[in-house]
Amino acid sequence: MIKGSRHFHFEQISELLEKKVHETILEVNLDAIVHNFNQYRSKLKPETKMVCMVKAFGYGAGSYELAKTLQEHRCDYLAVAVADEGAELRTEGISIPIIVMNPEFSSFNVLFENHLEPEVYSFRLLDAMIRETERRGITSYPIHIKIDTGMHRLGFQPEDVPAICERLRAQSGVIARSVFSHLAGSDSYVFDDFTHQQLDKFTKAAGELESGLEYKVIKHILNSAGIERFAAYQMDMVRLGIGLYGVSASGQKGLRNVSTLKTTILQIQNVPAGDSIGYSRMSYVKRDSRIAIIPIGYADGLDRHFSNCLLYTSDA
């Protein structure tokens, strides 16, 4: 109940509050996040660091709430997709190191003002970072060097390592805090030979980088599936992504579901046999049917191409 004199315009506040009430909600269980975090932590050596991926609004689970919880449970690093995500976390009081996986050249101000640590994957980006730190009078700003060992997205080539070392030794603006790569098929035994090729390439390239720079560089290549299946290669740090949210590549038992999508039924209709339902008449009922309409669609991430699919769980 909202009460007060008319000149306070409480009816406007009431309208705003009503707009905040949705019949479709995604519940996120932070206790499950902590449980999954500890499940993966138990597979690691005590000294192995962990990066947790909270990019893309925490895969829809709420980046700040996740980041705060992970910070409280001594996560070593967080990783976001773009600098703006990291800046928002800083505004909310997140203080642990944050890696920006896809830094844009236009985001340097945001990076430096919020002490966000960029992934550096090309000489163009490396040179731009060096110039910007020199212009600002900054020294030893942490960056994270990415090596492409077979994923073929972003990254330097392994043969670029000598030139990277030469560039880094010739300046004082940035320092390589870590070197890493990304496994392409660690979630399937079908690609194990390729995964081992990637691991071998990275081990060699990372060793060359560290030797050429003559200082300790954090090394990491394992993602969630890699932690489950290739823990022997945990090196100095691992990156926990989809596993944090309860999805296991190898069917690992013990992970807990993090998210629950809840909604209400708007209407129930009787549809005669032979009639179609929905866009493009993709679904036809073979018998007289009773259907329920729920308020979930594009805005909730449910694409129309998922039409005519059966969703089944023990709770359905």
Language-model features, listed with the residues they occupy:
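Short glycine-rich anion-binding loops that position phosphate/pyrophosphate groups of nucleotides
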Residues: S5-H9, D148-M151, S224, G243
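A structural micro-motif recognizing beta-strand termini
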Residues: I294-G301, S307-N308
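Anionic-ligand-binding alpha/beta catalytic cores of soluble enzymes and soluble regulatory domains
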Residues: Q198-R287
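ATP-dependent carboxylate-amine ligase
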Residues: M1-H35, A83
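Active-site-proximal beta-alpha core segment in soluble small-molecule metabolic enzymes
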Residues: I25-E27, A32-V34, T48-I218, Q234
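Conserved small/polar residues in nucleotide/adenosyl-binding loops
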Residues: Y312-D315
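Glycine-rich phosphate/diphosphate-binding loops that line cofactor/substrate pockets in enzymes
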Residues: F37-T48
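Glycine/Thr-rich phosphate-binding loops of Rossmann-like dinucleotide-binding domains
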Residues: F10-E11, E88, F108, Y189, ...
